[in-house]
Amino acid sequence: MVDNYHSSLDVAKTPIQSDADAQKSEAETEGPSSKSSQIAAGESIADSVRNFLELRQGGIPDDTGVVFDKISAVGSGTGSQDAPTVTSAAQSAFGLLSPLQNRQRKQYSRPILSGFSGTINPGEMLLVLGKPGSGCTTFLKTLSGLWDEYKEIQGELTLGGHPLLDVMKQRPQDILFCAESDDHFPTLTVAETLRFATRARCGPQVSAREIDTMVTQLAKLVGLGNVLNTKVGDAKIRGVSGGERRRVSLAEALATCARLICLDNPTHGLDSSTAVEFMEMMREWTTQSRCVAAMSVYQASDAIVSYFDKVLIINSGRQIYYGPVRDAKAYFEDLGFECLSTTTVADFLNVMSADPDVRRAQENRENQVPRTAEEFERAFSASPIYQEMQKSVQVAKERFQTNPSPLVKTSAFALPIWHQIWYCAGRQFRIVTSDYSLWAVELATIVVQSLVLGTLFRNQQRTTSSLFIFASALFYSVLVPALQSMAEFGNGFAQRPLILKQKRYQISRPIAYALGLVTTDVVWKVAAICYNIPLYFLTGFQRTAGNFFTWFLIIYLEHLALSMFFRSVAIFSPNMHRAVLPVGIFFNMYVLYTGLYVPAPQMQVWLGWLRYLNPLYYAFESVMVNEFRDLSYQCSASDPVPSGLGYNDMAHQVCAVVGSEPGDRLLSGASYIHAQYGFKTSHLWRNVGINAALFVFFALCSGIGMEMLKTPAGQLATVFYKSSPGVTHRRDKIDSETGQDQGNESSEMSAGQSNDALRLQEHQGPDKSHNLAWTNLCLDIKTKEGDQRLLNNLSGSVKSGQLKALMGVSGAGKTTLLNALAGRSTIGNLTGTLALNGQVLPTFFRSRMGYVQQQDIHLPTQTVREALQMTARLRRPESISVADKNAYVEKVIEWLSMEHIADALVGVPGAGLNLEQRKKVSIGVEMASKPEILFLDEPTSGLDGQSAMLIARLLRRLADSGQAILCTIHQPAAELIDQFDKLYLLSRGGNLVYDGSLGTRCHEAIQYFQPRSRPCGPEENPAEYFLAVIGAGSRNDAHMDWASLWNDSEQGKEREKAEESLVPAAEQAPQLEQQSLYSVPFHVQLWVVVQRTWLYYWREPDYVNSKLWMSVGNSLLNSLTHLQSPNTERGAYNRVFSAFMSLIVGPPLGLQVQPRFVTLRDIFVHRERESLTYHWLAFVLSAFIVELPFTFLSSLVYWLLWYFPVGYFNAPSRAGYSFLMYELFGVFATSLAQLCASLMPNIEAAFAANGFFFMFCNTFAGTLSPKPVTPSGWRWFYNISPLFYLGEGVTVDVLQDLPIRCEESEVSIFYAVNGTTCGQYAQDFLKTATGYLLNPASTTECQYCRYRDGQSYFQQYGYEFAHRHRNIGVFICFIAFNFTMVLVMTYLTKTRRH
């Protein structure tokens, strides 16, 4: 039950109009609508809304009104700044050291909204209009109380008579802001998504059956009834269509039943009919629930506008109109503006927010109309409408002051926190089980690792020679979970926007999501038993239930504690690049201070305390105690000193193992681990408790960190510009909301088109005329239900100088057709004929086709000019000089009015160009190639009406210059569709229903449909009419077979004959002259792509800084731990394992490399590969080449801070060898990381695979599992383990010729036979021994040092100094193999047939 406030404000209602509706603009996954998906027969929208509200609320709620008076919003920053580079980052770092410079740092701010006032009465809908960047989103966020994103909010804002801040504190669930982006868990179904939101907002008292009823009813309201059991999906996971995904977002928002609903561009991705249908439903929703709704809508038709009560028009952050919708047009006409008969009221109002030259003044009033935002604001302030609005504000304030309604505090969340955690955990279980790719990789890797390690250490005997093997096996048992936990650290970054959204919706607290993940982990980590069982029993650990389950509990808690720790680090990091640095350093520290490499007694005083922060240390001590405490170990035949013939009396021998007593053949396990590692048997359960406590602590930290998540205000809406000598930027005009430079864009693209004509008069179009024709095009895919046809015998053509619109209802296959024509179809079986100028279309011609995708896919660090220049250099013929190509790019920039952003980085949404600018860049990239044929997939999607019109006029002018263009569109205004020559209209199932001329005001196409259906109304949008009559919309009842009508019509038959004449018979088809698949030679491709990739690295200093600082941190950790290792047995051990620890940094290095490789790969796969921009080999080579300098630099930094402090040899030949090998190791780590990234489907799986392969290589490096004691079945693996050659080379290099002098604690003591000296007694033994006697003249106590020098020490690992130089070549071969496999896997998985 929802409590509400009271308001006596009147409701101004707009008559509800019904219109034909449609589903989304592109829905390859949609099938025909079923009866269950639609509103029940005979049930009106009003009845459906009423039924849901009664289910959800138990009745009609009371009223709530909004009053805002002189509200202003101030944002942080200037809105634009120079792009950071490695150089600028270094300068900034040095600048921070200057106290004076720090004091001079200034906090910049910028106004976004200025002095807005108005009221929204209960049951009213407010339409917010404005050009992108004018402040529409900021206004909605301000109404919604999302003030954290801004530096300051000023003015008075009340809801139900109460200050908004009080409402946010007392009843935040009554306010909702639905963003334009669609953030969902992609592997959940639509029903699961809506059920979670509905359950969370209804509370625990509502039964599951009632929840299901609500979900069904809500899905019907937004037309999702037929896809309830379909995955939501995203850009990578196939699910519902984009329009349906948008409706899922809207349904989720409505499920909250908020009192104030703010929707940011809710019709984005919806076709015109579906958009009207949604607004009709919202009109009923607000009227019946008496809630308040405010929406920004781009490309709003008159039908959509008619549902609103009031409209707010914003121009550059200033309020230029607020009042009734019905009075808005007359108001601006009174100011002197003219609304043409062909212009919709929505476009006329929207253009008031645009630039001066776009607006049309009445004759003889050109100099009297307002031009700037300030002039508009002054004109509105002087108008009667403004005075009436101010009066209504004051009246509302007085009414609330005299008759205030109570503000009853209720819980913001309908579900108690424990219920939220429970439902979040259940949802996470569903996500884990439905997204099998990641957990399948994880499970496979741990099972394989377990089998490898178990068989490698199998059936160890209880002898002293197995002590180190047991310790190594136990170390691996705690290391593998650590690697797995580290690989999972980045899993939550993609969900951050979703978590913030659900917090905003009061669906669930972020801490509930975090603890739900913890609950899932507690159960899912039990799957680690798949790892534990083989390793434990194959190795030969104590086979008792008590020991096994104790061991399992220890590993289990360690895994949980580490997972929570790395997740906490990631949560408190702003992004993945920043998180990699602490994760890599902490991982290295945890492994180093586990207690094996550096036992506690040998830890340096200044760093030994780190072990107390280390879950691995507690786990390793516990598993060692669990295994060793109750056992004794027989002294092995090789361990007694002296040994051999004549040495059979143990009374005069000692087992040369730490912890042994002279004359005793048995070694107590407890004594050994205490003497060697400093472990105490009493610590077993203490450590279990500590790790359990660390798990709880880090879990709470992750929850607290998740609860603290918010969008940082200082990083919003910033445009970065290229910074270089001679480059100046025009930043005189900044978008009030996004902070983006507008320059004189609109003055250069005016509605009068005079400037447009001048700009394009030099555009000659393609060099030749072309006619692309297709006949009998069919596309069939296999589904669970059988074969499904997406395209059904389609025929058509597009000619030079022709602008053809491709439209269709839901599931028509518009994008599928474009992909098929452009040679980009990747699914199903495509049949039919494609011909160019009467000849079979060759593959190489694809590089001459331009394809503007619906998604704007660009490298964020490229400038607009660089993006266009790259395309021109790679896709235009080599015969054209680079200078001419660049000159043509400048013309394209001018044609698209992008001069002011030519040197701006494309960036990402929210930190880069806005949607309109990004769309222009996408078009410009394709125009820069001077294509013969241009395809565009919904280029106006998400743009406001005026921006869409500018794009349409641009296409019109391109067509007039001779360009052949086929363009899909949705939500087209009547004026916009009038720019097109032809219409290619599809119905569901990929059937053609019309292919012909549109005519003036679409007269010809209307004449075809009207005799066969209803007439088109005089004010009706022709585009909406076409979709309506052929059956668009979730409630449309049209059942006519329009495809058959077209095929049987005279126009259809004539068109078919004309198109068949353009396509030759297969046996007679002439071939175009064969040309190279790519426009320029490979070396040119490689050079251009390398330049682009270099700038990608150079302009993201976070990556380089992270790489260098990780090298600094890990090298200092290693060197300070082993600082100036002495020439003792322990010192030799330290030297070996210090070298080995330098290899443990491999997995963290992979965490840095892989995301960048995947980013470059995705851009290549989704855009550049399809257009044959460059060969796939150029992508792989460039990614590897550009990594090398940064890899070499970071390896150099690591080596300098590690090698000399440890105390290794200073001789150039020795130091140089280690330096070379470590540089090669950096290259190897990079190549292995890129190999895993090329092999795996996503970055999370790549992280897991990288850890697995490094684990495998480290296992056979020869230090933890020495080759001489390895079972023969595994010994050959050392020959294929790259780290064995590296470990051998570096180890022998740092130990050869090193004299070893044992300390007192390292000496083995035995007693000489009476009458002999120690030297005499042991002389036969010493002839073959690796050590020496310290006191050969003694006749009693003999002191034996096990190792004489470094070479005698490293022989135990099977290393040989003679292999030193050979290993360089072998290691280089492994690097070459890795890189070759990167090429092979990229070719097999990402290139298809190219």
Swiss-Prot record:
The Swiss-Prot or TrEMBL record describes its family as follows: Belongs to the ABC transporter superfamily. ABCG family. PDR (TC 3.A.1.205) subfamily.
Q: Where in the cell is it found?
A: Vacuole membrane; Cell membrane
Specify the effect of residue 640 to L. In strain: MD-8
First-listed, main subcellular location of the protein, grouped into a coarse class = membrane
Outcome of substituting residue 313 to V? In strain: MD-8
Taking every annotated instance into account, which residue ranges of this chain make up the domain ABC transporter? 98-341, 767-1013
Q: Which GO terms describe its cellular component?
A: plasma membrane; vacuolar membrane
Biological classification of the source? Eukaryota, Fungi, Dikarya, Ascomycota, Pezizomycotina
Q: Which residues cross the membrane?
A: 437-457, 467-487, 511-531, 546-566, 579-599, 688-708, 1131-1151, 1177-1197, 1219-1239, 1245-1265, 1280-1300, 1368-1388
Q: What does this protein do?
A: ABC transporter; part of the gene cluster that mediates the biosynthesis of patulin, an acetate-derived tetraketide mycotoxin produced by several fungal species that shows antimicrobial properties against several bacteria. May be involved in the secretion of E-ascladiol to be converted to patulin by the secreted patulin synthase patE.
What's one Pfam family here? PDR_CDR
Here the segments flagged for biased composition (Polar residues) are 737-755
Q: Which GO terms describe its biological process?
A: patulin biosynthetic process
Q: What is this protein called?
A: ABC transporter patM
* Keyword Transmembrane included in the entry's annotation: yes
Q: Which gene encodes it?
A: patM
Result for mutant: residue 897 to N: In strain: MD-8
**Residues where ATP binds:** 808-815
Tell me the null mutant phenotype: Strongly reduces the production of patulin and leads to the production of a distinct dark-red pigment.
Task: Give biotech applications.
Answer: Patulin was originally used as an antibiotic and specifically trialed to be used against the common cold, but it is no longer used for that purpose since it has been shown to induce immunological, neurological and gastrointestinal effects. Genotoxic effects of patulin with dose-dependent increase in DNA strand breaks in brain, liver and kidneys have been detected in mice. However, more recently, it has been proposed that patulin might also have anti-tumor properties.
Spell out the residue ranges making up region: Disordered: 1-41, 727-755
Protein keywords: ATP-binding, Cell membrane, Membrane, Nucleotide-binding, Repeat, Transmembrane, Transmembrane helix, Transport, Vacuole
Xref: SUPFAM superfamilies? P-loop containing nucleoside triphosphate hydrolases
Q: In which pathway does it act?
A: Mycotoxin biosynthesis; patulin biosynthesis
Listed GO MF terms: ABC-type transporter activity; ATP binding; ATP hydrolysis activity
